[in-house]
Structure formats: C-alpha cells, structure tokens
Amino acid sequence: MATKKGTRKRRAKKNVETGVAHIHSTFNNTLIMITDVQGNAVAWSSAGVLGFKGSRKSTPFAAQMASEAAAKQAMEHGMKTVEVEVKGPGSGREAAIRALQATGLEVTAIRDVTPVPHNGSRPPKRRRV
C-alpha cells in the first residue's frame, strides 16, 4: 500500500514580541533557532536546509542566509526584539548576528555561551595537511 504524501497543518500564529535567537555555529554548518523567552521554538533555519552543500555550508554567507530565513519566520509570528546567544567556534557567528539586525529585528543583547571544558574529553588530533 502506497503511503499518503500528506500536507502538514500550518502551525497557528504565535504572537511573541520578544525572544531569544540561538546561533549554533560549528566548523561545518550554522544553525539558527529563534525561541520565546521560555525556550519554545518559534522559528529555525540552517545553512543545510537552504540548499548549501558541503564546504559551502560553513561560509559566512550561508550563515547570513539562514539567519535571514529564521528572522523572517519569526517576524511572521510577531517577533520584534531578540537577545542573541552565540555558541561554537564557526565562521558564521558575526554574519548571522548582522543579518538578524538587517532584517529588522532589534537585538537587545549578545551573549557568548560557548561551552568551555574544564579539561574534559581529549580533543581530536591535529590535522596535517
């Protein structure tokens, strides 16, 4: 029996004025999730979702596009101001923050929440190119 390719219901519009933009920037990708103050997801996007493949996902331009897409989704739900939490060492950190400001969201605070180990697990070996 063939599976039905269903159309998913569009989520109800959430009226959220302020929120938190979580930017997770890795060496390979940049993920942006915009939540309300309690942490419930309002909108999200990533460089991979937008069609960037391979090494193009890790570029600042891909992070900028992902950030703009997430911001537009959040603004459809009525979001106006965001606090930004940046996590990770990737190259798309600053580009994503600038794109959030350019789309019309007011950035009230920027926090770096990159986890720093207190001498935790052993890091990967150094690359010899």
From Swiss-Prot:
Q: Which SUPFAM superfamilies does UniProt cross-reference here?
A: Translational machinery components (SSF53137)
> What GO molecular functions are on record for this protein?
rRNA binding; structural constituent of ribosome
Keywords for this entry?
Ribonucleoprotein, Ribosomal protein, RNA-binding, rRNA-binding
The terms describing its cellular component in GO are: ribonucleoprotein complex; ribosome
Domain of life per record: Bacteria
Check the record and name the Pfam families matching this protein.
Ribosomal_S11 (PF00411)
- One GO biological process term: translation
Coiled-coil spans are none
Cell division listed as a keyword? no
Report the sequence similarity comment from the record: Belongs to the universal ribosomal protein uS11 family.
The record describes its quaternary structure and partners as: Part of the 30S ribosomal subunit. Interacts with proteins S7 and S18. Binds to IF-3.
* Function, as annotated: Located on the platform of the 30S subunit, it bridges several disparate RNA helices of the 16S rRNA. Forms part of the Shine-Dalgarno cleft in the 70S ribosome.
Q: What is this protein called?
A: Small ribosomal subunit protein uS11
The taxonomic lineage of its organism, from the top, reads: Bacteria, Bacillati, Bacillota, Bacilli, Lactobacillales
